[in-house]
């Protein structure tokens, strides 16, 4: 019994020490929401947080460990990867120790946040460690990391740290409020672009698209011959698609020869590498096959 008690005490002490070390670089982010979120001091004077928690672009404040409140400014936000970057005066606040190493399923992890200056922690495991995936908004995320732990909204944007003591990802709430994590390698890439330009490059088609099934259900469109494609429901007057000759009511059925079934597939194809490329669109126009070449533009800043 004594050995068991000593082992548990040692585990408890090491866990608390790991949280304490990590929490030195974790802040609370106040941006007009119902409650604050958390953020990671990623580089000197640079805080990373979850893009979805920012209710406004101005009047952002940070609560540092210990409770001191400071002003922060938005450097950029990328909803496609759920990464936002803030600038502030660190005044000696340590930068988080990070790693690009991918976690494994079963790894024991800690989610560390900041609640009004106090440390916030949740213990769990990596439930699923998968490969690259695309978010619903088209962002490329290097690893799919699903967590088996209780993540509160206040902890969203905080650090996911492994037994080695390094921050491997940022914790966020995914669909159905399941805890997932954005890996450090994805964050690094987003931070570089957001600091340089305030946004992450994304391709721009300049066309509003909708699944043809929705139109069929209302009797609006006959669809393509084989049932594939997405319907063009709006066009940017100055956008690439309008300039190339795309028309309202066209059905996009293929992208460089690859069949298109869902709007989400088009979003995935409009990644940073697509800007400036010429794409061959397969179409159904008035019930007949057609084709069009479109030079992909850069998504304008809203």
What do these predicted ranges mean?
Residues 75-82, 129-145, 193-201, 212-229:
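Gly/Ser-enriched beta-turn/beta-hairpin loop segments
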Residues 23-25, 84, 88-97, 120-177, ...:
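Active-site region of chymotrypsin-like
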Residues 1-19, 111, 163, 167-225, ...:
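C-terminal cap/linker of serine protease catalytic domains
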């Amino acid at each position: 019994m004594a050995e068991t008690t000593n082992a548990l005490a040692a585990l408890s002490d090491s866990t608390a020490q790991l949280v304490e070390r990590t929490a030195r670089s974790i802040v609370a982010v106040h941006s007009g929401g119902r409650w604050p979120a958390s953020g990671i001091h990623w580089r000197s004077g640079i805080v990373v947080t979850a893009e979805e928690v920012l209710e406004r672009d101005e009047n952002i404040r940070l609560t540092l460990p210990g409770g001191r409140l400071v002003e922060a400014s938005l450097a950029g936000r990328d909803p496609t990867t759920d990464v936002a970057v803030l600038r502030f005066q660190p005044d000696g606040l340590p930068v988080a120790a990070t790693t690009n190493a991918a976690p494994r399923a079963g790894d024991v992890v800690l989610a560390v946040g900041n609640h009004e200056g106090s440390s916030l922690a949740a213990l769990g495991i990596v439930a699923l460690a998968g490969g690259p995936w695309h978010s619903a908004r088209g962002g490329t995320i290097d690893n799919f990391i699903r967590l088996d732990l209780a993540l509160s909204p206040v902890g969203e944007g905080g650090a996911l740290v492994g037994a080695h003591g390094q921050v491997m990802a940022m914790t966020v709430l995914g669909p159905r409020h399941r805890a997932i994590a954005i890996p450090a390698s994805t964050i690094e890439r987003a931070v570089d672009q957001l600091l340089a330009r305030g946004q992450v490059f994304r391709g721009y088609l300049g066309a509003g698209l909708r699944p043809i099934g929705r139109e069929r259900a209302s009797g609006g469109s006959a669809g393509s011959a084989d049932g594939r494609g997405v319907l063009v429901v709006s066009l940017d007057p100055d956008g690439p698609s309008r300039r190339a000759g795309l028309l309202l009511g066209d059905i996009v059925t293929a992208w460089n020869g690859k069949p298109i079934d869902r709007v989400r597939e088009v979003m995935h194809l409009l990644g940073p590498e697509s800007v400036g490329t010429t794409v061959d669109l397969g179409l159904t126009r008035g019930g007949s096959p057609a084709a069009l070449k479109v030079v992909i533009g850069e998504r304008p800043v809203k």
